[in-house]
Amino acid sequence: MKRLSIDLETYSSFDLGKSGVYKYAESEDFEILLFAYSIDDGEVKVIDLASGEIIHEEILQALKDESIEKWAFNANFERVCLSRFLGERLKPQGWYCTMIWSAYLGLPLSLEKVGEVLKLDKQKMNEGKALIRYFSIPCKPTKTNGMRTRNLPHHDLEKWSTFMEYNQRDVETEMAIKKKLSAFPMPQSEWENYCIDQNINDRGILIDEVLVDSAIKFDEILREENMDRAIELTGLENPNSPLQLKEWLNKKGLEIDSLAKKDVESALKNAEGDIKEVLGLRQELSKSSVRKYDAMKNVKGKDNRARGLIQFYGANRTGRYSGRLIQVQNLRRNNLKDLELARSLVKNGNYETLEILYESPSDILSQLIRTAFIAKEGTRFIISDFSAIEARVLAWLAGEQWVLDAFENGEDIYCRTASRMFGVPVEKHGVNGHLRQKGKIATLACGYQGALGALKAMGGIEMGLSEYELQSIVDYWREANPNIVSLWWDIDSVVKRVVKTRSKEKYKNLVISYEKGILFIQLPSKRRLAYPKAKIGMNRFGGESIVYEGIVVGNKWDKIESYGGKFVENIVQAIARDILTEAMMRLEKKGFNIVMHIHDEVVIESDSSSIEEINEIMSIAPIWAPGLILDADGFESEFYKKD
C-alpha cells in the first residue's frame, strides 16, 4: 500500500461551522459514522461504523504510518477526526490535501465547486447536505419522532443507504480531482509548508476565558443601558430599527438617507441635543464589539486553546493565508495608552470604573479583543513582524534602487518618498514634515497602479486633500518611481503576449507561461501562481485586458478581469508570503512554537528565546532573493496586542 484516499461522515452535537473541527471532535458524543477509503486508487469501500462494522487493522496501521500517503479533500478534517477516534495525534507528515492542491491551481476550496469547474464525470452528490442535516447533527425532538434528539441509521434505512453512496462518491470525486491535477504537481516545499501550517493549527493559542466571559457580560449590560436610554429619548418600541429611527430623525428635522456608519458619523458633526445623543447611542448599539469574543468562546477547546484559526492557501491568487472562525486576520487595532488598565478593569468585572474613565466602553471592548489571546503560564509572546515588506519586495522586483537604498540606510520610507516626489528635504516632525503624510498615502495607494480612486479609498478626501491634490500625488509618485511604473506595463505586455501565443517567457526573475488553458507566473521561489482559463478580453475603456476565472464576491466562480498593476500586486504579495513561509520554516526548525501569524507577523509562545534572536531569523532573505533587504521588528508581551 502506497496511498490511501479517505472521506469520513461524522456526528457531533457541536456546530462544525462555529466551533471548527478541533472543538467539534472534542464533543463527548463525537462519532465517526462512515469511513470510505480507496487503496492505491482502487475500488472505494465504505465501512459502516455506526452499524457496528470495524476498520481493518491494516488500514489503522496505514493511518499511523507516515510513509503511506493519506489523501482527502480538506485533509485537516479527516486527520483531526481520526486522531480523536484513535486516541492519539496523527502528525501531518504523510497527509496530503486535494483542496490545497486545488487552491494552488487557482481553483475553489470546495469539493462541489472544484468538481463543477473541472467538469468531472462523478460530481459530489446534491443529496449530501440534507443527509448531513439528518444524520450528522442533532435533530429537534417532536411527537412524530418520539422526542428523540438524534437520527440513527435504523430510523431511515433508505436515507442511510444513500448516505453511504454519498460517502463513497466523495472519495471517487476526490480521486478524480487528483487525477485531473496530476499534470501540475504542487512543489514538495509547499507540502512541507502545509505540514508546518497544520502543526501551528494543532498547537492553537490560549484564550483568556475570564476576560472573554467578562467582556460578553459587560456588553450585555451596556446594550441594555443604551437601549433603555434610546427608548427614553425617542419613545420608540425599537430604536435599533433603522426604519423606526430614520422616521424619528426625519420628524426631528434631520433628513438622513441611511444609518450606515459613515452617514451617522457625518450627521453627528452638526447634530445637537437629543439628536446628537440618539445618533451616539445608535453608534454604540450597532457595534459588534463582542462577536469575536463569542467566536472565541465557541472555538476554544477543553484546554482553553483555540485551534484551526489559519487557512493554508486561503487566498488562492497569491497563496497567502486567511483567517477562519475568529478571523484573526481582521482584528481591531488597539491604540489605548493604558491598555493594561482597561484590560484589568474588564477582566475583574469593574464595569462602573470603566464607564467613568472611558467615553465609549464598547470601543474599549473592541480594542481589547487582541488581548484575549494569552501566552500559557511560564511563557510570554514574542511578536515579530516584517517592516514594510511589500514596499521592499516591489522595489526589489522593479529595481527601484533609491527605495532599496532608503531601506538599507534605515530611512523613513514615507519621508524619503515625499522628498523624492517634491524635490525637497522631508523630516518627520521637522522640515517639510507636513509632506510626509502625502508620501505615506502615495506609498500605500500607488504601488500597484493605483490612481485617484485608490487614494480616495485610502481616505485622501477625509484627510482634507482635494481631487486636484490627489491627482498630483499620483503624478509625482509615478515620476519618482519610473522602474515600478515600467514593471506594471512590462508585466501587462508579457502576460498578454504569452496568452495570445500560448508560449513561455522569462521576465526578470519570473517565468510566465501558458499551459493547458492556465496562465502560470513562476515566482523566484519556483512556486507558481495560476490563473485558470485565461484569455484576452476587452476592458471598459475598449482596450485589451486579461480575463481568467476564479472566485469572486459571494463565493461564486466567475470571470475576473486583470491588468499589469493587479498582476504585480499578486506577484509582490505572493513573494512576501514565500518570505514569511521560509521564516516560519526556520523558526519551527529551531524549535520555536508559532501559535499564530497574521499577515506579515508571527506570534511565538516562548519561555526563553529573545526578541533579538527572532527578529534576526525573520530578517534573513531567502537565497532566491539576492539584494533584498529585510527588516523585522518586535516586542514581548503576556497577551497579544499591536505595539
Task: Please tell me what each predicted stretch does.
Residues M463, E616-P626:
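A common structural junction motif
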Residues R169-M175, G565-M585:
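Conserved pre-motif C helix in the palm subdomain of viral-like polymerases
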Residues S5-I6, F73, W95-C97, F373-I389:
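Conserved catalytic palm subdomain of right-hand nucleotidyl-transferase polymerases, strongest
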Residues S27-Y37, D41-S182, K337, T417-F422, ...:
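Active-site-proximal helix-loop-helix substrate-binding element of RNase H-like nuclease domains
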Residues M1-K2, L60-K64, L365-R380, M585-K589:
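A short acidic-Thr-Gly-centered motif at the start of a beta-strand
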Residues S12, N76-E88, L105, K246-K251, ...:
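Short active-site loop/helix that positions an aromatic residue
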Residues L181-N193, I579-H599:
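Active-site palm subdomain of RNA-directed nucleic acid polymerases
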Residues M1-L16, L34-A36, A130-L365, R380, ...:
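Conserved "right-hand" nucleotidyltransferase catalytic core of DNA-directed polymerases
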